[in-house]
């Protein structure tokens, strides 16, 4: 985007007074909790001991009824310091949490489980669902306990005993003084073991504490607006009656007298082009020379537009700085690139916010605590997790090469589909391997006419997971590619159907070619097993073989030894490589990887990993032109694979922190457990099995033999939980003082029948069984994984002596040594503790759990884990262009940022880094990385971010309302404002006194009072989001419906699962929710197997208890009989499918008559809202049918939402607001207008309830002159939507018709280019064909180029006409003066006020001149609004007059 207009504005405005400040707030839908409760919650999250300390000291901390929040805060902080309850780092984390009000959602969530108050106190004992008892009503002689208790994840478990049958005391409180006697009573009883003591929160009854909660953790920006077309309303809009946000005045609402460069005016002044080029360098130099670099950084970047001129007249950049930057940018990070690490973890600059930083700090603190428990000092922790030995590889998991060629199977297993060296379409590709030495663009593959990159797809006809593999193989085969693809068709010996399919595939391939064979196989996999296989077979054979005799002989031939031989070779290949028919695995250059959401990245990563190895060999002459390149890659590959040892996906590996398990069961020193071998061993095996059974003893025998050969290994025996009989093995081991591997072998070689082992000490034996049960519970061994083998924390489930042998166990030990033990021994150096073998085994175990712990759960496409970490940040030097806090190297939490100071990332992160730098234990280092040459102004917006390192209070000691303030905005300049909030927030305008889309602030002088304009937004929802997939197919359950319910209503809201990543979003708010398949086809087809891919779906509860929202990863299992069915595959012409669904939708649980005409539209800014009123009037004017309007709520102003009811009532139409949060995985649009265009086209499948079959989009600035029922009834001839083609009858505009020349002319190839101002959508057809998914995929691809999709909402559907057909509406459905002749206006059914690039006429002027009825409509609407406003004034005055003094 070019900002030449900015210079024009700056030239005109040479003297400009200061503008009134603009304050921005976001209000939650729920009230603020009591501050005492917020402290309690934050302490509970920080450290449970701190929470209990707070309860014990409430009487001292709340020393008076009127203790202010500030006094309470100071008392708590000082007491925590004085009594060393929290470390300095924990105390800062607590203060940060309080400053963000991060505990408020958790406290609000209690409202979903706490019964309504029925007593006259703020703290009570909950006896049962209805009965509540105040302390004064408790009997003095014997305490009461709760009669019913249902455990809830929200509960504060103050004291929980392990004994059974102990009653519960459930105390509900606001954490004020009346909790004190309850706590003193029940805490004492709980410590005596007489009860379990649980606390729940309920807000206080005192109205003074029920204040509105204004949240933090969001950004907002005010941008200079493009003025190519003026879109400002020329009327003053009416304000709502009630509180006037313009009256908001703050103690902070004072202009600072100390500004950068000594600036005194908020004016935009010119910057010459030669100075623009070096602005980034000048900014770096100015910040570096400041005495307070962090503050200067934030002020300069956030208010850059007013500082640009002053920056440009600073002294020239020093040569020393340029030289330093040249060295940094050439060695480490290219110029202008932004990146931030926290202790080596790479942060997502866009997604990371204040709340996620708080969460990360807590995770880091937990990590430091665990390392400390392992005997490692905090100063050494970062040396381990960022050590280069770990950082360069995926420690416990790397793709091992296996011999995937089928020479061992006599070349009869693999069927090559895309055989590069023999396929004629590759004849023109270079055959010389020297081509590999030529440079190509990063990420590309050389177009070599030889087999190098190879992908082999195992296809099992009876497995649903094979269908997406086969689909991908077919797609690969349709286009030339440097990747050779093949497949192996395999089937179990007892699977007659699959065997016949594979044999038929071999036959068709031989007789009719690969294409026919693939089509046959696809149809077989895409139909159910009852399909007529031989009819499909006949369909794909040459016509000459369609006679009855040939087909009869064919059935016999398929049973012959010839095809049996091929089948056996295929199955032999699959078994040798350990391919599981249900695992959806693919072989890439010998590596066996999972076909999951990371498949593409893994595949290309393998290709790019192999290329350098081959290139070096070619350059050194180690490979000749005649050598097979794949053989070279596989020269050291293993012949066989055990998938238990080498799984195809890291996500399949489960890791356990074995030290934590031992701590939790009270056996850190091996109390009451059976340990074979030395307790001080590097290799710690745990075996969970039923030692009363032969299979458990057989695997134990293998391990005993292994231990006898390796003195550095020990073995812990754990009896499987289901059998409570003392195994004879245990009896013999318990009766002997020996616990060696030799003694174990002797026992195993002796008789182990039940009578052979006499238990001398039954109590001891029962303790062993009890301890085993506790360990099994800690390990989470349920369902399919009841037995397990662990080695230093890595867990293998579901094994036997047939699936795991001695060689496999030795390989596990070798992998453990290579990937962990050897590296940890080297890192340990002089650490005495790490020289202890047991400590190293514990540490290895813990590192594995870090490897499987995601840094964030918000995205399935980002696999960043807590370990290993990037070590490069340790190598970045410190120079003149670097800021660093004191004692950075000693900090627990080291933030290292590489930032271009004049970038949008810096506007946000300058505030965040400044705030976190105030926390104890936090170190901040910033390497400024400017672009050395700029061609345009880098920033054209003002920015603020709401964050504070601790709570802030006003002069009276009350918590100050959270807001951000723009106090440097230029007056009389057209601006536009927007909010940057995390993707889990649904934020809407609530109370605003200006047009935020077209801001023009009035100027004031310094002497004038500076009461602020205030924009109040509302946090309407916190989302539950997810990325779902089917259990075996690993593909999204597209079209599945999910419902979200609560404890009182099982169906509150619902949604559809998208094909894009299996994504879904559901609008929620803090509370306890349930997630289930929608009643109907979804519940018939699917059950939810798990909510997070690993844990079983025992409880459908979803807890929304933080501002971060909830991100799930559900796995769906198809129910029997629906394995191959398509949930969307039903006759949609009669709407049967959607008629079934709509009956269960939450939106339509009541009967209502559906409107005949459904119209949706979007508007932003008061002018377009004015147009929108008039559009609705024009629609109603030309129809007698029932009309309903659907308005996209995201962009509407509060004034519109307060006025539209009067319009709807006057003209008798219905309306409803719709919205959908832009998913964070879908590339966002930074300009608001382009975001609006995105909403017009990208979410049509999820914006509307499923009951809606058809909808018409009408631009807000359009005038309708026809009955839109005609458009609703129009046959779209199978297309999902209909658009009007662009007019070409106005000849003088021919030069502007871009679709008739260049790219579009070539692309369209005779197809029409359509305008998006009006279109009709068949929503049923749209959803059925997955049009929304296709549009979003193509958008994601094209939007990567910022110069594409100039008219997003219009270009995208036109670009996809070959996949999503457009029905061309008759030309008279849309007339636009810019493109259409004056003569055609006579028959126009709608008139669009589209822009004219020649005249750039204002919208209002054009409307009044061009549309004869527009002014009368406008006046009539104005009259309706005036009447409604007068009525509102009257009602407000009556209410005001009737109010009591207290209410006022």
Swiss-Prot record:
GO terms for cellular component: endoplasmic reticulum; endoplasmic reticulum lumen. The keyword Nucleotide-binding does not apply. Pathway: Protein modification; protein glycosylation. It comes from the Eukaryota. Its EC number is 2.4.1.-. Residues 1432-1441 have a biased composition (Basic and acidic residues). GO terms for biological process: N-glycan processing; protein N-linked glycosylation via asparagine. Residues 1-18 form the signal peptide. Transmembrane segments: none annotated. It is found in: Endoplasmic reticulum lumen. GO terms for molecular function: calcium ion binding; D-mannose binding; misfolded protein binding; UDP-glucose:glycoprotein glucosyltransferase activity; unfolded protein binding. Glycosylated. The keyword Endoplasmic reticulum applies. Gene3D superfamilies: Spore Coat Polysaccharide Biosynthesis Protein SpsA, Chain A (3.90.550.10). Glycans are attached at residues 66, 749, 880, 1046, 1441. Keywords: Endoplasmic reticulum, Glycoprotein, Glycosyltransferase, Signal, Transferase. Residues 1428-1448 are annotated as: Disordered. Its cofactor is Ca(2+); Mn(2+). Its main location: endoplasmic reticulum. Disulfide bonds: none annotated. Residues 1149-1448 are annotated as: Glucosyltransferase. Monomer. Belongs to the glycosyltransferase 8 family. Selectively reglucosylates unfolded glycoproteins, thus providing quality control for protein transport out of the ER. Unfolded, denatured glycoproteins are substantially better substrates for glucosylation by this enzyme than are the corresponding native proteins. This protein and transient glucosylation may be involved in monitoring and/or assisting the folding and assembly of newly made glycoproteins, in order to identify glycoproteins that need assistance in folding from chaperones. This is UDP-glucose:glycoprotein glucosyltransferase. It comes from Schizosaccharomyces pombe (strain 972 / ATCC 24843).
């Amino acid at each position: 985007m070019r900002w030449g207009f900015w210079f024009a504005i700056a030239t005109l405005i040479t003297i400009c007074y200061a503008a009134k400040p603009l304050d921005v707030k976001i209000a939650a839908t729920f009230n603020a909790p009591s501050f005492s409760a917020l402290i309690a919650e934050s302490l509970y999250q920080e450290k449970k001991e701190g929470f209990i300390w707070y309860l014990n000291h409430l009487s001292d901390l709340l020393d008076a009824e009127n203790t202010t929040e500030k006094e309470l805060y100071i008392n708590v902080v000082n007491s925590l310091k004085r009594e060393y309850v929290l470390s300095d780092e924990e105390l800062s984390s607590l203060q940060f949490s309080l400053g963000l009000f991060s505990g408020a959602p958790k406290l609000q969530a209690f409202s979903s489980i706490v019964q309504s108050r029925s007593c006259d106190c703020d703290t009570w004992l909950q006896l049962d669902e209805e009965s509540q008892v105040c302390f004064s009503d408790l009997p003095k002689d014997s305490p009461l306990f709760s009669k019913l208790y249902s455990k809830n994840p929200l509960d504060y478990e103050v004291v929980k005993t392990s004994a059974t049958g102990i009653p519960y005391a459930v105390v509900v409180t606001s954490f004020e003084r009346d909790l004190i006697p309850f706590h003193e009573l029940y805490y004492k009883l709980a410590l005596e073991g007489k009860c379990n003591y649980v606390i729940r929160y309920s807000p206080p009854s005192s109205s003074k504490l029920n204040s509105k909660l204004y949240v933090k953790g969001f950004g907002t920006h005010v941008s200079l607006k493009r003025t190519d077309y003026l879109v400002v309303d020329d009327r003053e809009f009416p304000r709502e009656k009630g509180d006037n946000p313009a009256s908001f005045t703050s103690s902070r609402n004072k202009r600072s007298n100390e500004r950068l460069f000594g600036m005194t005016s908020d004016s935009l002044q010119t910057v010459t082009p030669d100075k623009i080029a070096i602005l980034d360098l000048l900014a770096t130099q100015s910040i570096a020379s400041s005495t307070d670099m962090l503050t200067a950084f934030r002020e300069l970047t956030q208010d850059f537009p007013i500082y640009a001129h002053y920056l440009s007249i600073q002294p020239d950049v020093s040569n020393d700085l340029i030289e330093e930057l040249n060295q940094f940018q050439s060695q480490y990070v290219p110029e202008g690139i932004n990146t931030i690490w926290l202790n080596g973890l790479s942060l997502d600059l866009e997604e990371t916010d204040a709340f996620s930083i708080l969460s990360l700090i807590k995770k880091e603190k937990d990590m430091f605590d665990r390392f400390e428990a392992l005997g490692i000092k905090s100063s050494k922790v970062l040396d381990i997790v960022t050590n280069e030995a770990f950082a360069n590889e995926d420690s416990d998991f790397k793709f091992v090469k296996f011999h995937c060629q089928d020479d061992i199977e006599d070349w009869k297993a693999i069927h090559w589909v895309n055989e590069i060296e023999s396929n004629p379409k590759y004849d023109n590709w270079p055959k010389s391997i020297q081509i590999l030495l030529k440079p190509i663009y990063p990420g590309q593959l050389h177009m070599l006419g030889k087999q190098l990159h190879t992908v082999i797809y195992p296809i099992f006809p009876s497995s649903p997971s094979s269908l997406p593999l086969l689909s991908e193989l077919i797609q690969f085969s349709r286009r030339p590619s440097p990747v050779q693809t093949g497949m192996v068709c395999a089937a179990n010996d007892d699977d007659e159907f699959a065997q016949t399919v594979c044999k038929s595939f071999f036959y068709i391939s031989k007789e009719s070619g690969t294409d026919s064979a693939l089509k046959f196989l696809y149809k077989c996999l895409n139909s159910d097993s009852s399909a007529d296989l031989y009819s499909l077979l006949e369909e794909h054979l040459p016509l000459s073989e369609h006679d009855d005799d040939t087909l009869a002989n064919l059935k016999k031939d398929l049973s012959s030894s010839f095809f049996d031989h091929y089948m056996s070779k295929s199955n032999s290949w699959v078994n040798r490589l350990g391919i599981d028919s249900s695992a959806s695995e693919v072989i890439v250059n010998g590596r066996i990887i999972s076909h999951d959401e990371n498949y593409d990245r893994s595949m290309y990563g393998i290709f790019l990993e192999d290329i350098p190895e081959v290139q070096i060999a070619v350059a050194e002459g180690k490979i000749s032109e005649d050598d097979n390149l794949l053989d070279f890659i596989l020269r050291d590959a293993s012949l066989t694979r055990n998938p238990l040892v080498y799984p195809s996906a890291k996500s399949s590996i489960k890791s356990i922190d074995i030290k934590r398990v031992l701590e939790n069961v009270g056996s850190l020193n091996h109390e009451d457990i059976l340990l074979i071998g030395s307790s001080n061993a590097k290799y710690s095996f745990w075996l969970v099995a039923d030692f009363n059974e032969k299979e458990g003893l057989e695997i134990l025998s293998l391990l005993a033999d292994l231990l006898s050969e390796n003195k550095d290994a020990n073995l812990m025996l754990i009896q499987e939980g289901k059998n409570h009989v003392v195994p004879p093995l245990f009896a013999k081991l318990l009766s002997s003082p020996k616990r060696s591997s030799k003694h174990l072998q002797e026992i195993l070689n002796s008789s182990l029948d039940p009578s052979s082992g006499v238990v001398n000490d039954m109590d001891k034996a029962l303790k062993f069984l009890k301890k085993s049960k506790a360990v099994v519970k800690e390990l989470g061994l349920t369902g399919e994984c009841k037995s397990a083998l662990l080695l230093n924390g890595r867990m293998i489930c579901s094994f036997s002596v047939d699936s795991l042998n001695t060689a496999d166990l030795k390989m596990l030990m070798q992998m453990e040594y290579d990937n962990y033990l050897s590296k940890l021994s080297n890192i340990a150096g002089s650490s005495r503790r790490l020289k202890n073998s047991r400590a190293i085994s514990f540490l290895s175990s813990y590192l594995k759990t870090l490897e499987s712990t995601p840094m964030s759960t918000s995205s399935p496409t980002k696999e960043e884990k807590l370990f290993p970490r990037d070590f490069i940040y340790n190598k970045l030097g410190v120079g003149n262009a670097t800021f660093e806090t004191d004692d950075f190297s000693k900090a627990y939490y080291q933030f290292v940022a590489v930032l271009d100071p004049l970038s949008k990332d810096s506007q946000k992160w300058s505030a965040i880094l400044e705030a976190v730098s105030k926390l104890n234990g936090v170190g901040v280092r910033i390497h400024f990385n400017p672009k050395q040459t700029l061609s345009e102004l880098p920033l054209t917006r003002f920015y603020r971010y709401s964050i504070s390192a601790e709570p802030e209070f006003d002069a009276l000691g009350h918590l100050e309302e959270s807001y951000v303030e723009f106090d440097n905005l230029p007056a009389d300049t057209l601006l536009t404002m927007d909010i940057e909030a995390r993707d889990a927030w649904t934020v809407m305008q609530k109370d605003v006194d200006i047009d935020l889309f077209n801001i023009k602030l009035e100027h004031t002088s310094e002497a004038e009072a500076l009461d602020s304009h205030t924009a109040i937004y509302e946090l309407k929802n916190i989302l539950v989001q997810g990325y779902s997939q089917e259990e075996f197919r690993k593909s999204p359950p597209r079209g599945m419906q999910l419902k979200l319910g609560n404890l009182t209503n099982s169906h509150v809201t619902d949604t559809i699962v998208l094909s894009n990543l299996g994504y879904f979003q559901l609008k929620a708010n803090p509370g306890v929710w349930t997630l289930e398949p929608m009643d109907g086809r979804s519940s018939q087809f699917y059950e939810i197997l798990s909510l997070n891919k690993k844990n079983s779906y025992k409880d459908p509860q979803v807890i929304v208890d933080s501002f971060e929202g909830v991100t799930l990863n559900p796995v769906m299992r198809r129910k029997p009989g629906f394995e191959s069915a398509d949930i969307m595959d039903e006759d949609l012409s009669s709407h049967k499918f959607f008629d079934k669904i709509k009956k269960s939708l939450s939106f339509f649980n009541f009967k209502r008559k559906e409107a005949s005409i459904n119209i949706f539209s979007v508007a932003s800014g008061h002018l377009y809202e004015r147009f929108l009123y008039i559009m609705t009037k024009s629609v109603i004017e030309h129809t007698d049918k029932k009309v309903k309007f659907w308005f996209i709520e995201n962009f509407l102003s509060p004034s519109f939402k307060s006025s539209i009811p009067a319009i709807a009532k006057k003209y008798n139409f219905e309306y409803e607001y719709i919205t959908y949060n832009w998913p964070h995985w879908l590339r966002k649009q930074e300009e608001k207008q382009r975001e609006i265009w995105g909403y017009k086209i990208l979410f049509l499948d999820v914006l509307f309830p499923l009951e809606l079959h058809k909808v018409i989009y009408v631009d807000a600035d359009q005038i309708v002159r026809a009955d839109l029922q005609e458009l609703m009834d129009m046959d779209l001839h199978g297309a999902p939507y209909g658009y009007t083609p662009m007019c070409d009858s106005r000849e003088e505009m021919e030069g502007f018709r871009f679709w008739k020349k260049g790219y579009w002319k070539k692309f369209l190839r005779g197809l029409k280019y359509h305008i998006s101002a009006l279109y009709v959508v068949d929503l049923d057809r749209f959803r059925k064909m997955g049009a929304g998914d296709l549009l979003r995929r193509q958008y994601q691809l094209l939007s990567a180029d910022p110069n594409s999709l100039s008219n997003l909402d219009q270009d995208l559907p036109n670009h996809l006409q070959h996949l999503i057909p457009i029905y061309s509406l008759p030309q008279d459905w849309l007339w636009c003066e810019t493109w259409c002749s004056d003569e055609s206006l006579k028959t126009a059914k709608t008139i669009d006020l589209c822009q004219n690039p020649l005249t750039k006429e204002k919208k209002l002027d054009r409307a009044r001149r061009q549309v004869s009825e527009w002014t009368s409509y406008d006046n009539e609407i104005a009259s309706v609004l005036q009447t409604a406003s007068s009525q509102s004034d009257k009602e407000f005055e009556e209410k005001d007059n009737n109010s009591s003094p207290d209410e006022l």
